[in-house]
From Swiss-Prot, chains A, B:
PANTHER family: PSEUDOURIDYLATE SYNTHASE (PTHR11142), TRNA PSEUDOURIDINE SYNTHASE-LIKE 1 (PTHR11142:SF0). The active site is at D62. This is tRNA pseudouridine synthase A. Keywords: Isomerase, tRNA processing.
Length: 284, 284
């Protein structure tokens, strides 16, 4: 997983979205429908290649998790890229299923690695608390919570979580991997028209289940079952707390991945590899 | 279909939403899954009744058409209403499938008829024209148009259609039914964040296929295949024009039904029955 394409290859950045409902997550798995698998198959077909060009992704999402601003890169032979560059998007649009869309395919700047060059990832988690349920048209990406939620209490709790911490209490354990993360943003807003609450969760990187555990803790504060200080107390204990409920995946959407200026991409990738052993496994 | 509940009955107004994707439309049909059928079954079950209480609806939507602001009424025996009033919403929420939600169930004012008392219906039709397709998370209620659309041209054409006209050119013919309608609003906006174009279409009532034919004509103007004056020329001809493409149903959502002040409900119902023979069949 280098930060330069091999000689004779072009590193292509892909910006894409998917509805995670009918996928077993991003990462390729035998006999499972995955986002990575669908895109690699489509690329192979539209470029009439016999080989599969592996994708590297910014955020490996779990089964049921969506993405609107996912980023990946793929290294294509120069000849393949030259032949297909112009029509690649339109052909992929025709070949890919409607629950995956690729918006942009363009040569990446030197030093670009979709995963290691990323500065941060921004997720949204959406929740409806209307007694009747969730708008049928958005039920695929909005969780229903059957108790009214107090926005201020949730934001009070959220403010105590931001910053660099050991998020062990909110992460699925993985041998040898650090759970130190910098949570840059955790903030709730309520849409005045629909009443839907959206959490914005942004960090340099996330460990597995981290976002959905943070949301689970927040909902217990929002519906009054726990005080606003509780999530931070759990955080301080640094051990997985069975009282923290990991919410369902369908409310979670990867909205954006940010990268530094081109000149800083390679340095960022090196930094991300060294400072912390980023998790090899899933992310949310 | 009177404007008063029979003695011993309470007329209950229901405000509801549904995702039309997996329904054969609103109106009950044997061996077909319909919105009316699902709700009447749920009502029968939660009230433990042996009889079915028939629903009267404001806008009978076709297969695949959604609703966010649909209104219906049902006449329930006073004893049934008294027993179930308090828990009806929560029980219906538990019994109904997630693609139908009832937000409110409350006694209707005297003279209320969900269909005939309505002043107007407001629909939205949503279209995406990004080359890559439509956001996978909203593809269920947004149509993809594979050519870029000119908002100004579409609004120029739309302005020529507003007012009271014979919309025969845009309606599925139905013997004995008038196609005179008052199109109160036809206006396009583009969401700056998503790029999705939304048409707001509001009229006292619609004849069958009218909205989707109006949208089909507008899209031909938007992508440059037809001039802005064309839809109005078709309108003036008063005969169904094969050049008018009826767009697919999934972009269409009934957003709101408006009613007059309580004191005017009965008069409005009488007016709606007399002035025009409102269509017995489908609406959009």
């Amino acid at each position: 997983m280098s930060d330069q394409a091999e000689p004779g290859f072009v590193r292509v950045r892909l910006d894409l979205s998917y509805d995670g409902k009918d996928f077993s997550g991003w990462a390729k798995q035998t006999s499972r429908r995955t986002v990575q698998g669908e895109i690699e198959d489509a690329l192979r077909t539209v470029t009439r290649s016999s080989v599969t060009y592996d994708l590297t992704v910014a955020g490996r999402t779990d089964a049921g998790v969506h993405a609107r601003g996912q980023v990946a890169h793929v290294d294509l032979p120069e000849a393949v890229w030259a032949e297909h560059e112009e029509k690649l998007l339109r052909r992929l649009a025709g070949r890919l299923p409607l629950d995956v869309r690729i918006w942009r395919a363009a040569p990446a700047p030197a030093g670009f690695n979709a995963r290691f060059s990323a500065l941060w990832r921004r997720y949204a988690y959406r929740v409806g608390d209307r007694p009747g349920g969730v708008d049928p048209l958005t039920r695929g990406h909005v969780l229903w919570h059957d108790r009214p939620l107090d926005l201020d209490a949730m934001n009070e709790a959220a403010a105590l979580m931001v910053g660099e911490h050991d998020f062990a209490a909110y992460c699925k354990k993985r041998e040898g991997a650090t759970t130190i993360r910098t949570l840059q943003k955790l903030r709730w807003v309520r849409d005045p028209a629909t009443g839907v609450l959206t959490a914005t969760v942004q960090a340099d990187a996330f460990c597995h289940n981290m976002v959905r555990a943070l949301i689970g803790a927040a909902l217990f504060v929002g519906d009054g079952r726990r005080p606003a200080a509780w999530p931070a107390e759990v955080l301080a204990a640094k051990v997985r707390d069975p009282g923290v409920h990991v919410v369902r995946p369908h409310g979670l959407t990867l909205e954006e991945v940010a990268y530094p200026a081109d000149a800083l991409l390679a340095a960022r990738a090196a930094e991300a590899r060294n400072v912390r052993t980023l998790p090899g496994a899933g992310c949310c």
